[in-house]
């Protein structure tokens, strides 16, 4: 395997490069100098913000803007995915989804109609209501943004920034699916599945969180498998070594392409090795595949290996993905 080629493909992948702009946004805000009524437990750099509302409970807040390329390629799928990605963000934190709001900007009414059909179908599939929002009826372009609220116990949150040295790196996927016909970077595992299974897959993360089996977790999103892991390690101020040949993948898909894919249901976690069997069993109960693929290290670099050779993908002492 040509690891240098893999590294080059990952480092130049648009799904990762688009995250660099986050740093400028983060540096604008400073919560340390403000006096807020509620406890901001987690803010930028995670799948959702976490705000404590009393001694035991927290609300989770997340938002996603749908990639313009996706909306142009397939408006229905863009609408459906706006629900999917938000629900997965809450699930990755070990939370339960409560409700969503949206902002939709309309230039083309036919496209808008398809987007809204997709949103409606997503709501039916994932069982999370769309309860309000804002509409721009005279916009210069078509844009869809969705926000979501979730709930969780304060002591049962799966954070991105809590990876520990020596943790095993675990990738978990639903491998039963298909590349989405009009957007090859998406692996669809939900449209053909029952509501019961799709929702159970999200609840699996709640079970892992409440049993305190993992130290950190992140939903695999637009940066792909390695990019998402890189973001987790960056905010944890750690590094890692990952054997990319051990990452679960469908046999028919090229490895480099798979490392860039946004899966319908996929997560990267770090956990003590002794907890892996229980984590694996929880995922298997909802028809997902989980494997140990690497280890968290103190050196702030992310390496990939094929079992023989090793290459640096990111050096967090010198560079960043999101700057959080």
UniProtKB/Swiss-Prot annotation:
InterPro entries, A to Z: Methan_mark_2, PurM-like_C_dom, PurM-like_C_sf, PurM-like_N, PurM-like_N_sf, ThiL-like, UCP036540_AIR
Record-linked Gene3D superfamilies: PurM-like C-terminal domain, PurM-like, N-terminal domain
Molecular function, one GO term: thiamine-phosphate kinase activity
Biological processes annotated in GO: thiamine biosynthetic process
Highest taxon in the source lineage: Archaea
UniProt-listed Pfam families: AIRS, AIRS_C
NCBIfam families, A to Z: methan_mark_2
Protein name (database record): Uncharacterized protein MJ0640
Source organism per UniProt: Methanocaldococcus jannaschii (strain ATCC 43067 / DSM 2661 / JAL-1 / JCM 10045 / NBRC 100440) (Methanococcus jannaschii)
